[in-house]
């Protein structure tokens, strides 16, 4: 059971929803050696408070020393690096217990242009939602993400879906086929073809997030974390045919590439 030490546990009750925030302090960033990446470029270095992590949790037990949570945290709130804060919250009107299933979704595009982008980018977006699912949906021709779980979504399952024949340019911010910025999301038994990042976890995604029994066929780039400090990420029985599974601080490499291209063009 995951428990958290707090200064005054008496103010909390079992069943309450809380937000736990872990700060990204200067000391933590320096310990990771991500304050500077060399090459004379300082803009890429992480800055304090730019990579704070916020988790939604439910209190399951009150103890003399603190509170216990329904789901463990994915990065330790270490007192050496500022510990963290806990706040009770309510989200009145938040959508929950909703599903999208048994559909075939197809984006119409200019058939004379195999890299047309003047058509639908996103098929399904999940925002401000809890306890939701997408199941047995067939996607074709979308330029961006066929399922995008945003940071305000939690407890989402995406399963038994297939994405084929995407239509777009080949490059950044395109074909992030199954993409999550949320927490407590599960993608299972997913198939995707010719994406860019077919199975992707975004910037500071709080997690845990899992991809299980998924297959990516002939993608143009890797699957994995596509920005910095996504934590609690699991890829289990995931086959990326023709590319890699990678966990990296992706923004650094993209920025360096852009600088090199600019110098070359000049």
Describe each region flagged by the PLM:
Residues 1, 5-6, 10-22, 92-111, ...:
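Parallel beta-helix/beta-solenoid
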Residues 6, 61, 69, 105, ...:
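Extracellular beta-strand solenoids
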Residues 1-54, 62, 68-70, 76:
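Autoprocessing Asn-cyclization modules and mimics
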Residues 80-90, 114-125, 141-145, 170-179, ...:
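Extracellular beta-strand/beta-solenoid scaffold signature
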Residues 96-107, 130-141, 153-168, 181-197, ...:
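Right-handed parallel beta-helix
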Residues 1, 54-56, 95, 121, ...:
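Surface-exposed or flexible loop/turn and strand-edge residues in extracellular/cell-surface modules
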Residues 53, 120, 149, 266:
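Ligand-binding pocket scaffold of soluble enzyme catalytic domains
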Residues 48-110:
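Extended acidic/polar, glycine-enriched regions
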